[in-house]
UniProtKB/Swiss-Prot annotation:
SUPFAM superfamilies: Carbamate kinase-like (SSF53633). Homohexamer. Its main location: cytoplasm. Gene3D superfamilies: Acetylglutamate kinase-like. GO terms for molecular function: ATP binding; UMP kinase activity. This is Uridylate kinase. The lineage of its organism: Bacteria, Bacillati, Cyanobacteriota, Cyanophyceae, Nostocales. ATP binds at residues 11-14, 54, 58, 161, 167, 170. It comes from Nostoc sp. (strain PCC 7120 / SAG 25.82 / UTEX 2576). Its EC number is 2.7.4.22. It is an enzyme of class 2 (transferase).
Amino acid sequence: MGTNYRRVLLKLSGEALMGNMGYGIDPEVVKEIAQEIAEVIATGVQIAIVVGGGNIFRGVKAASAGMDRATADYIGMIATVMNAMTLQDSLERIGVQTRVQTAIAMQELAEPYIRRRAIRHLEKGRVVIFGAGSGNPFFTTDTTAALRAAEIDAEVIFKATKVDGVYDADPEIYPNAKRYNSLTYAHVLAQDLRVMDSTAIALCKENNIPILVFDLTTRGNIRRAVLGESIGTLVGGSCEIS
């Protein structure tokens, strides 16, 4: 079966890994995500992943409570490495070769982030998981996803969330909210639709990297996205509401 993409970057929030738990990592959820990734790898598509850390620690929240912002962000980076290693373990248990690369040196645990090495791993069919964000405080993991996607020449960013796309209003508050099928980068920025932070959107716009926002909790959606099926909201095209 043909796929729409050769190389994709999957952005997973930390919250996606905790399932219905209020904190931490749900092993069953991680196992399901790993299985979906394995199915996509089997089609020949190359996958890189950026993971967040909000299920363990949120730097912005800690900073608002009085912690030094840079320190809080560094702790958040460590949380992303915990998530990356957990996902790596689940993938390797089902036979998917995986490498974790971190933007902060943790040589006993993971490779350092080296762009050429990451690309070589992808070409060999390995999943590459990027941990520790960009290695710099004050930048989100969404911005890291946009940055890494540009660096490795990914054709698209899959932003896997708990909602089935981008809406013109919060669907939990406004039941008549409309879901966008597609959006321009400019509309996202002008309407502050919070698909990703503005730095990430600007990076994607500058490098012509589309962003597909879809519901991770629907089994098979990662594969559907790779196959080009109509799911979620595509940022980078025209503005079209459903």
